[in-house]
Amino acid sequence: MVHLVESPAIAMLDVQVDFDGGSRRDPAGKAGLASMMAAQLENGVAARGSQPSLDENALGEAWADLGAQFGASAGTDRLSFTLRTLSEPDLLAKAVALAARQIGEPAFLDVVWQRDKQKVLASLKEADTRPSTLAGRAYSQAVYGNHPYGYEMTAASVANVSVPDMRAFYTASVVACRARINLVGAINRGQAEQIASALLAQLPQVACASLPTLAPVAEVAPLGQPVQQTIAFDAAQAQVLVGQPGYKRNDPAFFTMLVGNYILGGGGFVSRLMNEVREKRGLTYGVYSSFAPGLHAGAFTVSLQTRPDQAAAALAVTRQVIQEFVASGPTEAEVKAAKDNLIGGFALLIDSNRKLLGNISNIAWNDLPLDYLDTWQARVEKVTATDIKAAMAAKLQPDKMVTVVLGAKP
């Protein structure tokens, strides 16, 4: 599947190649496998035919010589390769050829992994001293339960990951016929198809129909009852997190929830939460709400930091605001202001090739309508206060949410 947005104004090309190889496919006990495997994809390519092997230093020099950038990363749902290069024919051809090698011929050297493993373990050890890390880990596990969305990389899970694990994960995930390739830049459709084929040329060329179907990933289970966790920690600020599983990215109510969340806590200083918790009571510098929809129901989260002795008061106000918003919905004035702000800021979502690429990749990955960007503002404008009240009541259950408070004091 190849999506192209022609952008001839600048002689550049941005490409993203996505595969179903995100952390949702991490095996139990090996949390972090996808992200660690993705990091190793940047550390060397194997020799093939007359092409010599290249270590990470040689790759870095090669990309610098081309004035191009290449990267690999694993998110929650997908494994992504990105390429940014000049569209001048000779440089473009060389950049695509080198990217194809990194996509199709990773070295996965054990000596490199053993070195990088120590860096990962040191990073985890440092992260475990941060209140936000500890609170976030407890929150994710409580919201998602046994679902992979709640898996958290630990020293134990890193120790369980081997180079053979990475190779197996890569082989299962990076399959040419399952790639979704998105391009934005100074090329035409014919060039886009050629580049897409070239990027996948080093992978086995097999039809998806002949391959076993990817194992389904279970859906996120709704919460059956409220969960309250209070974690002792000596810190200058207490961490407060409240939320639950939300909705999928392709949910028909996406735009309704977008506007609704802007009013509740996504709009910064114009949101209800900020007004009630910060402006009226001075209990925090900032409080925000967000949804993280993906292929599965990502979390709805309200987060804030406050003085340890004010945590209980801040939490009480936060819960009250959520309950009232879900029960009564927004006012007409709030809806108009939110829609005006969102529509007014739409241009900033697509004002660069990289932002366009992110949007096009999002459309392709989530099977959204091809006119998604063309109709974005109109869909926001159609949202009503009644829509928001109904959608919030359907998606959120304030009496069954997870609450994590870390570092509170009486």
Language-model-derived ranges and their functions:
Residues M1, R180-A186, A221, L304, ...:
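C-terminal regions of mature proteins
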Residues H3, G44-S53, L83-K117, G267, ...:
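M16/insulysin-pitrilysin zinc metalloprotease superfamily fold
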Residues Q16-L83, P148, E152, G268-G282:
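M16/MPP (pitrilysin/insulinase) zinc-metallopeptidase core fold and M16-derived inactive scaffolds
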Residues S23, Q69, L241-P245, G265-T306:
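A structural supersecondary motif
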Residues A58-F169, G190, K336-R354, G358:
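Acidic/histidine-enriched segments that form metal/cofactor-coordinating
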Residues K119-R137, A218-Q237, R278-T284, L295, ...:
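Short acidic/His-enriched helical or mixed secondary-structure segments at domain edges of catalytic enzymes
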Residues S132, R137, V163-L199, K400-M401:
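Non-catalytic, conformational "gating/processing" segments within enzyme and secreted inhibitor domains
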Residues N146-E152, R180-K248, V405-P410:
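An aromatic/glycine/proline-enriched structural segment found at the starts
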